[in-house]
Regions:
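Glycine-rich phosphate-binding active-site loops on the catalytic face of alpha/beta enzymes
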Residues: 91-101, 134-144, 178-200
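Conserved beta-strand positions in the central sheet of alpha/beta enzyme cores
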Residues: 22, 47, 71, 93, ...
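Catalytic cores of alpha/beta
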Residues: 34, 77-87, 120-128, 145, ...
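Glycine-rich beta-to-alpha transition loops that act as phosphate-gripper elements at the mouths
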Residues: 24-27, 72-78, 94-97, 114-119, ...
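A contiguous pocket-lining binding segment that forms or flanks enzyme active sites
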Residues: 129-134, 146, 153-156
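Histidine/lysine/aspartate-rich catalytic loop segments that bind and position anionic ligands
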Residues: 95-132, 136-141
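Conserved N-terminal beta1-alpha1 strand-loop-helix module at the mouth
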Residues: 1-90, 107, 156, 167, ...
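A charged, well-structured terminal subsegment
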Residues: 141, 150-153, 201-202
Length: 213
């Protein structure tokens, strides 16, 4: 899967809902009900970050839930790509971009949403064929004003900004012409996960899925 094909696949996923939940899950036993709650609320594309020992098992469990598309986030090395695929991930997300990660994704045919924070990084990825990128860490590197400015000289690159995105500021990102969707953790906060408040998470997901209405 070359970069052009990867970006086409990622773009189709980004257009399924305005928000991709960025999930940090410690307990694989709650993976399925968490996924079901988010999907019920209208968020069907789920990013499970590889930040916990159980993350790969969480991906495997969430992949069993109908109606969702589960990917692996926080891919930081080539071996993560193989592990993610073996766990059942259908796409990958990286905070930054290295040759090793991009090559592994191409060889293993895993669509990747590669991370970039500067115009130079964005241009390098675009020249490789990645027309859809993760803008990270969005708020820390200038937020919506920076992303809007980048769209001037680089109008053909589309983004999923992530990092510091909240329900309160998500809409202003989504109204930018170069933003396809946003990544956010607010739809599945730690306290609701720990309390197994699936109804509460569904409500947050529903509000996020309807944020542009």
């Amino acid at each position: 899967m070359n970069p052009y094909e990867a970006s086409k696949k990622i773009e189709s996923l980004c257009r399924l809902a305005p928000v991709i939940p960025v999930l940090v899950v410690d307990d694989a036993n709650i993976a399925q009900p968490l996924a079901e709650a988010l999907i019920k609320g209208g968020l069907t594309v789920l990013e499970v970050t590889l930040r916990t020992p159980s993350a790969l098992q969480v991906i495997s469990e969430m992949a069993k839930v109908q109606g969702g598309v589960v990917g692996a986030g926080t891919i930081t090395k080539a071996s993560d790509v193989t592990d993610a695929i073996n766990a059942g991930a259908q796409f990958g997300v990286s905070p930054g971009s290295t040759d090793d990660i991009l090559e592994a994704c191409e060889q293993k045919k895993l669509p990747i949403l590669p991370g970039a924070a500067t115009s130079t990084e964005i241009m390098k990825l675009f020249n490789l064929g990645f027309s859809v990128q993760k803008f990270f860490p969005a708020e820390a590197v200038g937020g919506q004003s920076a992303l809007k400015a980048i769209g001037g000289p680089l109008p053909h690159v589309k983004f999923c900004p992530t990092g510091g995105i909240t329900y309160q500021n998500a809409k202003s990102y989504l109204q930018l012409q170069n933003t396809l969707c946003v990544g956010g953790s607010w739809v599945a906060p730690k306290n609701l996960i720990e309390n197994k408040d699936w109804h509460g998470i569904t409500n947050l997901a529903k509000a996020a899925s309807e944020i542009l209405n």
